[in-house]
Amino acid sequence: MIQTQTYLNVADNSGAKKIMCIRILGGNKKYASIGDVIIGVVKDATPNMPVKRADVVRAVVMRTKKTVRRQDGMSIRFDDNAAVIINKENNPRGTRVFGPIARELRDKDFTKIVSLAPEVL
């Protein structure tokens, strides 16, 4: 459950380390869950990388601390809130993705991110 002003870890090698959610895309939504696209501002970044501090970026939420219930009755929860920075075509800005991701991203057509991930839960 991600809302505005929420800090998220960045789980790729685009250069950003932490982003803060400033808007949730897709109608008048208060909260974002796994697979939702948000707009965020980079709060912490690695020097000499493509994404700089204070850049406004699009990102897709890939892990949340809030439990997500699936249709088959199973629930899944992660240890952190994490996102992957994407471009306008929903392709990741980085070339690697760190940590596990949820199966819900495959259902929402983020197949490039799913293919880069080391583990899909």
Curated annotation (Swiss-Prot):
Role noted for this protein:
Binds to 23S rRNA.
State the compartments where it is located.
Plastid, Chloroplast
Could you tell me which species this protein originates from? Rhodomonas salina (Cryptomonas salina)
Show the GO cellular component annotation of the record: chloroplast; cytosolic large ribosomal subunit
Protein family per UniProt: Belongs to the universal ribosomal protein uL14 family.
Q: Which UniProt keywords apply?
A: Chloroplast, Plastid, Ribonucleoprotein, Ribosomal protein, RNA-binding, rRNA-binding
MF terms from GO for this chain are: large ribosomal subunit rRNA binding; structural constituent of ribosome
Q: Main subcellular localization, coarse class?
A: plastid
What NCBIfam families does the entry give? rplN_bact (TIGR01067)
Please list the GO biological process terms of this entry. translation
Q: Name one Pfam family in it.
A: Ribosomal_L14
Q: Which InterPro entries match?
A: Ribosomal_uL14, Ribosomal_uL14_bac-type, Ribosomal_uL14_sf
| Protein's name in the database | Large ribosomal subunit protein uL14c
Identify the CDD domains for this entry.
Answer: Ribosomal_uL14 (cd00337)
The subunit field of the Swiss-Prot or TrEMBL record says: Part of the 50S ribosomal subunit.
Q: In terms of domain of life, where is this protein from?
A: Eukaryota
